[in-house]
Amino acid sequence: HLELTRDIANRFNGIYGDVFTIPEAYIGKSTAKIMSLQDPTRKMSKSDENPNASILLMDDPDTIIRKFKRAVTDSDMEIRYSDDKPGIQNLINIYSCITGKTIEEVEKEFDGKGYGEFKLAVGECVANRLKPLQDRFYELQKDKTYLNSVIKENDEKAAYFANKTLRKVQKKVGLTERIR
C-alpha cells in the first residue's frame, strides 16, 4: 500500500506541483525482515497459511513459546550466525533485536547450548516483550467510553485534514468553481 501511495503522490505532484507529501517507509536495520519460523527463506507474514510460521502481536505466551520451539532449524546444534543456517540466523536476529545484544553476544551466551534451550529463550524473550503491549490492549478494550471518545476526536481531525487536502487538490486540478 505504501508503494502505491508513493506512486500516486509522485504522479500527481509531477503533473500538478507539490501537493502531497511523499510517504517514506521506516525500516529498522536489525529487523528489516523477520523471516518465517517455518520457512526462514521467506518473510514472516500474518497471512501465511501455516499458523506456526508467524508470531501475532496478540498470541498468548504459551502459543509464542510453542511456535518458537517448532521453528525450523538445521540439523547442526551449534548456535552460530551464518548464511548457511537461515533458521538459526533468523532466531538470532530476533533475540538480538529484542534483547539489544549483539550477534556475537548472543552466540557467546548460547555457546555449548542446544537449539531447544535457545528456541525456548527466544520464545520467552518475545512473549515477555509483547506482554506490556497485550496488557495495555486488553485494558483499553474494557473502556469503551474512552475508545469511542478517541475515535470521535481522531475522526474529526482526519476529516479536517482530508477536507483541507481535498480543497487543495480541487484547486490544483481546476474544480474549485464547480465543487463546494
Show which residues each predicted segment covers.
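Conserved nucleotide- and phosphate/pyrophosphate-binding catalytic cores
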Residues: 2-180
